[in-house]
């Protein structure tokens, strides 16, 4: 038993050394990006604390944890993230949490949210693409069709997208934030407005203004130019662009697998097991 424990410990140490060697030889750029972004997030967190904005300070803390996640995952799961994928993950986290939420790029820059969700769909598909290999590391012979493998990766990406929308909805409901961005619309259709209680939608078009009253009849808010959709359009839009990102990667992956391309575009974004050659050489 002691011998088995020692073997496992030595294997973990070898994997850690292999990962460190990989960073020194092939992934210096991702390490530099990580250190720069971590420094910027720490500066941002200090500024938020000085301003008394604890919510943004906690968001910075969350960003630091997320930035560390790729390093932790590689060490824990004994895998190697491609340099391009790792850099993309770091930039995605910084763009979403710091630039998007704290610096309000979601409100200032048009389509910022759409761009990030599209990238998320692409990257999540890359991770899903590698899951079959990573979760079946004890199976030496796995012969799956390219279509099936791409389908699994696509479904994984869409599942991540749906879970993220669940997270946004929960934050909006319980923390009174607005992660599911609202949209002013001029047309609604609802069976709740049917005076006879029938299952027939009543269409209200050309809405010019919405006035919100409290229970005492006092005006709380006036919404000009329409009616607030409470995040539905944003949710569907996010899922749709996630779908597009997942489809794009799946198509590239299918073509590469079909034509047996070893040095392909998708390999720059697909995690693999820790390099056995490096481990043996240590």
Residue map of PLM features:
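Membrane-interface helix-boundary motifs at transmembrane edges
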Residues: 73-84, 138-144
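Aromatic-anchored segments of alpha-helical transmembrane domains
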Residues: 39-44, 91-101, 158-162
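Cytoplasmic-side transmembrane-helix entry/capping segments in multi-pass membrane proteins
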Residues: 61, 80-91, 113-118
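Alpha-helical transmembrane segments that form the membrane-embedded catalytic/substrate-binding core
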Residues: 117-124, 152-202, 229-253
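Structural signature of hydrophobic alpha-helical transmembrane segments
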Residues: 51-64
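N-terminal membrane topogenic signal
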Residues: 22-36
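Short, highly charged, low-complexity non-transmembrane loops/tails of multi-pass membrane proteins
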Residues: 263-282
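Membrane-interface helix caps and helix-loop-helix hairpins in membrane proteins
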Residues: 49-54, 76-79, 102-112
């Amino acid at each position: 038993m002691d011998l088995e424990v020692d073997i496992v410990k030595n294997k973990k140490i070898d994997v850690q050394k292999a990962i460190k060697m990989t960073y020194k030889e092939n992934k210096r750029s991702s390490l530099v990006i990580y250190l720069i972004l971590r420094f910027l997030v720490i500066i941002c967190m200090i500024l938020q604390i000085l301003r008394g904005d604890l919510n943004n300070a906690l968001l910075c803390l969350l960003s630091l944890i997320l930035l560390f996640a790729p390093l932790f995952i590689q060490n824990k799961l004994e895998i190697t993230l491609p340099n391009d994928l790792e850099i993309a993950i770091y930039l995605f986290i910084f763009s979403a949490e710091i630039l998007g939420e704290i610096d309000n790029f979601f409100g200032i820059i048009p389509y910022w949210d759409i761009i990030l969700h599209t990238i998320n769909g692409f990257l999540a598909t890359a991770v899903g693409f590698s899951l079959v290999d990573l979760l079946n590391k004890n199976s030496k012979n796995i012969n799956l069709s390219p279509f099936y493998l791409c389908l699994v990766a696509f479904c994984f990406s869409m599942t991540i997208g749906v879970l993220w929308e669940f997270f946004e909805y929960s934050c909006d409901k319980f923390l009174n934030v607005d992660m599911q961005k609202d949209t002013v619309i001029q047309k609604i259709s609802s069976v709740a407005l049917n005076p006879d209680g029938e299952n027939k939608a009543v269409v209200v078009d050309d809405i010019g203004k919405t006035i919100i009253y409290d229970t005492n009849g006092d005006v709380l808010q006036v919404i000009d130019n329409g009616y607030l959709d409470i995040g539905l359009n944003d949710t569907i839009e996010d899922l749709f662009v996630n779908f597009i990102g997942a489809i794009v990667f799946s198509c590239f992956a299918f073509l590469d697998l079909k034509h047996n391309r070893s040095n392909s575009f998708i390999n720059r974004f697909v995690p693999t097991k820790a390099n056995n050659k490096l481990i043996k050489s240590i």
